[in-house]
């Protein structure tokens, strides 16, 4: 669900996860609010640690039965693990229909079933529809589900109010890249880098654009800048590996795939598939 976007929020989340894992390792009780447990589960799911995410949710619902945040995370976890009917059942059990996160979840389930008009109507009823956080969530939902025109409608909703806002600029860049408007996306990513040169996600935006354009040397250089900003940024290792794979540089490709697997940036089976192909060349 991507709740933790700002650097301060990410720092708080890292501390929270560290405290949770230390308490678990020591078999020590640690009381956490439902929203804290939901954030931990969300992080585990984003790292493809689905069993750990389920453990947190199960524990959370024992001490916070029926909590909306935890039920939302449970539904998304079922979606992540291709258990659509279970996800629907959990979503239907949530009583807070007015909650914007609930509406986003139910809209995703509708889009999974190809029910675009129903999803559009549901999203139009979100109370804080003109807030930037909501616009970002809805644009990415439509893009992820393959509805770029619907995404553009919501992107335009924020243009007059947020056009100079860094988060809105990042959203615009990602929209342009996702809809194959690569040159325009590059312009936006460079503007974002001028604002925040140590944000690895902006450099990764450039990487993907250059990779699509087959400007491999520029893509590798942008990967290096992303890793200079965050040497644990697994996606940069994955794309750097793809670049070396493209250049038939087996040793560097394998080294970077191994690092990407270690950081859980790509599924191990995918990484080892590339490594095996390079090993026999």
Indicate where each model-derived feature is located.
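Start-of-helix register in tetratricopeptide repeats
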Residues: 35, 69, 101, 133, ...
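Canonical tetratricopeptide repeat
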Residues: 73, 105, 137, 171, ...
């Amino acid at each position: 669900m991507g709740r933790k976007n700002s650097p301060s929020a990410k720092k708080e989340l890292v501390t929270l996860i560290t405290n949770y894992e230390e308490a678990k390792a020591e078999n020590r009780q640690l009381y956490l609010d439902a929203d804290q447990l939901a954030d931990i589960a969300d992080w585990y799911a984003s790292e493809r640690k689905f069993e750990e995410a389920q453990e947190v949710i199960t524990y959370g619902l024992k001490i916070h039965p029926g909590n909306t945040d935890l039920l939302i995370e449970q539904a998304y976890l079922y979606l992540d693990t291709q258990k659509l009917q279970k996800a629907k059942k959990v979503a239907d059990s949530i009583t807070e229909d007015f909650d914007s996160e609930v509406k986003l979840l139910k809209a995703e389930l509708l889009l999974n079933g190809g029910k675009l008009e129903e999803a559009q109507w549901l999203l139009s009823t979100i109370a804080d529809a003109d807030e930037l956080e909501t616009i970002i969530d809805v644009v990415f939902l439509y893009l992820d589900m393959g509805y770029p025109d619907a995404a553009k409608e919501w992107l335009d909703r924020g243009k007059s109010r947020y056009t100079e806002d860094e988060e809105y600029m990042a959203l615009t860049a990602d929209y342009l890249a996702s809809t194959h408007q690569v040159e325009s996306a590059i312009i936006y990513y460079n503007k974002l880098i001028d604002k925040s040169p140590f944000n690895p996600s902006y450099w990764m935006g450039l990487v993907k654009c250059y990779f699509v354009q087959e400007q491999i040397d520029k893509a590798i250089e942008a990967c290096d800048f992303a890793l200079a900003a965050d040497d644990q940024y697994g996606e940069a290792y994955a794309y750097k590996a793809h670049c070396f794979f493209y250049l038939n540089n087996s040793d560097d490709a394998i080294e970077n795939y191994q690092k990407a697997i270690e950081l859980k940036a790509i599924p191990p089976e995918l990484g080892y598939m590339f490594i095996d192909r390079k090993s026999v060349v």
